[in-house]
């Protein structure tokens, strides 16, 4: 066996195998409001899109987690400021995750599970907007890995700032 193959085999052995299984994917909550229909259709369509995304995790049992993806999309018209529509979706899933702990488990729950749920939520939002007879809304993909890294960096920064603000003990 060559040295490269031995190194690759050693690295593969060191990596902990893990299991991620989708148990169920479902809509936990959905709301679509178009408060200014039908008068909004008589205005020039220059939309301003608002997009908010968040995740929530609930541990249901050992190795069993519910992940909820919260997405709020709102559109107002640029000229009048009138709200065209507000769409709120909570797309959820139950996942079995084995073989991960600590930061690796947190990464899976904050990145891999939402990546599974997002296409379902995106399709639901597009369908609701279409049923409201608005122009098609195609939401861009989301890089949940990058969002997780940003979250970790913010946590580190907040911890460092909190440490700086803590007064030093008085010496006698």
From Swiss-Prot:
GO terms for molecular function: unfolded protein binding. One of the proteins required for the normal export of preproteins out of the cell cytoplasm. It is a molecular chaperone that binds to a subset of precursor proteins, maintaining them in a translocation-competent state. It also specifically binds to its receptor SecA. GO terms for cellular component: cytoplasm. Pfam families: SecB. It comes from the Bacteria. This is Protein-export protein SecB. The keyword Protein transport applies. The gene is secB. It is found in: Cytoplasm. Belongs to the SecB family. One of its GO terms (biological process) is protein tetramerization. Homotetramer, a dimer of dimers. One homotetramer interacts with 1 SecA dimer. The keyword Cytoplasm applies. Signal peptide: none annotated. Gene3D superfamilies: SecB-like. Keywords: Chaperone, Cytoplasm, Protein transport, Translocation, Transport.
């Amino acid at each position: 066996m060559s040295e490269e193959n031995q190194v690759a085999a050693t690295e593969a052995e060191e990596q902990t195998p893990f299991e991620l299984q989708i148990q169920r994917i479902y809509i936990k909550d959905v709301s679509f409001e178009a408060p200014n229909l039908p008068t909004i259709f008589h205005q020039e369509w220059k939309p301003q899109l608002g997009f908010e995304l968040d995740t929530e995790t609930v541990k249901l049992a050992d190795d069993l987690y519910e992940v909820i993806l919260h997405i709020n999309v709102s559109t107002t018209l640029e000229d009048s400021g009138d709200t065209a529509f507000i769409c709120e979706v909570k797309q959820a899933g139950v996942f079995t995750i084995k073989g991960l702990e600590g930061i690796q488990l947190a990464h899976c729950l904050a990145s891999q599970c939402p990546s599974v749920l997002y296409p379902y939520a995106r399709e639901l939002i597009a369908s609701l907007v279409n049923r409201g007879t608005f122009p098609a809304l195609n939401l861009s993909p989301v890089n949940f890995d990058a969002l997780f890294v940003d979250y970790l960096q913010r946590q580190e920064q907040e911890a460092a700032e909190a440490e700086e603000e803590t007064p030093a003990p008085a010496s006698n």
